[in-house]
Swiss-Prot record:
It is found in: Mitochondrion intermembrane space. The gene is cox-23. Transmembrane segments: none annotated. One of its GO terms (biological process) is mitochondrial respiratory chain complex assembly. It comes from Neurospora crassa (strain ATCC 24698 / 74-OR23-1A / CBS 708.71 / DSM 1257 / FGSC 987). This is Cytochrome c oxidase-assembly factor cox-23, mitochondrial. The lineage of its organism: Eukaryota, Fungi, Dikarya, Ascomycota, Pezizomycotina. InterPro entries: COX23, Cys_alpha_HP_mot_SF. A motif (Cx9C motif 2) lies at residues 53-63.
């Protein structure tokens, strides 16, 4: 089974927050882009065999989950509803 890498960088940190808040509304920012790219590279290496890349998919899902939870938490602390 493929390894998702030992890098477990927090997706929503001060640097990411500043980038996210400073971007225009039409600009897309995904702090989990690196994890997404690793999963796509795994698919290419393994001729599209998703079972070989399940660790990478799980790492991406976990990254997105952490990112969304941290954003919600910061919005709650700031008193923003949306």
């Amino acid at each position: 089974m493929a390894q998702a890498g030992s890098e477990n960088k927090e997706p929503w940190n001060e640097e990411t927050r500043a980038k996210f808040e400073g971007k225009s509304r039409s600009e897309y920012l995904d702090p989990c882009q690196e994890a997404a790219q690793r999963s796509i590279r795994c698919l290419h290496r393994n001729q599209g065999d998703r079972t070989m890349c399940s660790d990478y998919f799980e790492a991406y899902r976990e990254c997105k989950k952490q990112w969304i939870e941290r954003r919600r938490e910061q919005k709650r602390k700031a008193g923003a509803l949306f």
